[in-house]
C-alpha cells in the first residue's frame, strides 16, 4: 500500500527558530513499501544556502552562527522525525500525549547533544545530520531501541481504537473508522521494523557522504548552479509569503527507494551513488530512480572513468618516452 507522510517545515517566528505546525502539510510525499524520505545535508535560508555539508561551526559568523546553533539545539531532531516518519501519531489527543511522553523529550535530548558536538568545531554539518539519524533510529541487537518501543506502543494504541470502534454510529461509519485506523496502523508498523530503520540510517549516510564529496570537488559557483529548486522550497513558495521564506531556515529532501540505493552502492560503489545523488540535486526525482536508471548511470560513470584513464595514459606517454631516451643515452 502507498503511504502519505507529511513533511515538517521550519520557519522563523519573531526572530527565533520554531517548528510551525501550520506548515506541517506544506510538502507531502507518496511512498512505496521500500521508499523513504532522505534529507539532504544542506540548510537553506530563503533561496540561499546557509550551511553546506562541509560547513563546520567555526565557518559560521555572526547572526548566521546564532541561528544555525539555535536550529540545531532546538529543531534538528524534530525536523528529521517529521520528514522521515511524518504525522502518524497526531490523529487524536491520546496519541499526541503518547508522543509527548515517549518521543518529545527524547528528540530534544538528541538535538541538544548534536548541537553541543557540532559547536565543538570538529564535525561537518553532514556528519552531524548522520549522527542525528543514528541516534533517533538506533536499533540495538535486541531490536528494542527507543523508536521501536514507541512504535509498539502506537500499534497497541491503534489496535485498541480499532477493536473498540465508536458505539453510537452507523455500521457504515464504523467500517470507515476501522478502515482509516487500520491504514494508519499499517503505516505505523514502520516504527518497529528494525530492518527498515537500519536502511534509513544507512541510506542517509550514503547521501550525506556523497553530498560532502560533491562539495569538496566543486567551486562555490558550480555548486550553486548544481542545486535545483527542491520540493520543500516549491511548497514554501506556494504556501508562505516571500518575507517569511527569506527569514526561515529549512532542509531539503527527496523520496528514494532505499533498497535500490543500497543495492546500487554495494554493486557499483561510491562513484555511482555519488552521481545518483548529484542527479537528485540537479532535480531528478528520487522516486524516478529505478534499476534501469541506475544501470544507465553506472555505464556513464564507467565510460567517464575509462576516458579519464586513457587521457592520463596519453599525457604520461611523452614523459615515459623522454625518460626512456635518457636511460638509453646514458648507456
Curated annotation (Swiss-Prot):
Top-rank taxon, per record: Eukaryota
Span list, region Disordered: 305-331
Positions with biased composition (Basic and acidic residues): 305-320
InterPro entries for this protein: DUF3654
Transmembrane segments annotated in the record for this chain: none
Listed Basic residues bias regions: 321-331
Family to which this protein belongs: Belongs to the UPF0329 family.
Identification of the protein by name: UPF0329 protein ECU01_0080/ECU01_1530/ECU02_1560/ECU04_0090/ECU08_0010/ECU08_2090
Native source organism of the sequence: Encephalitozoon cuniculi (strain GB-M1) (Microsporidian parasite)
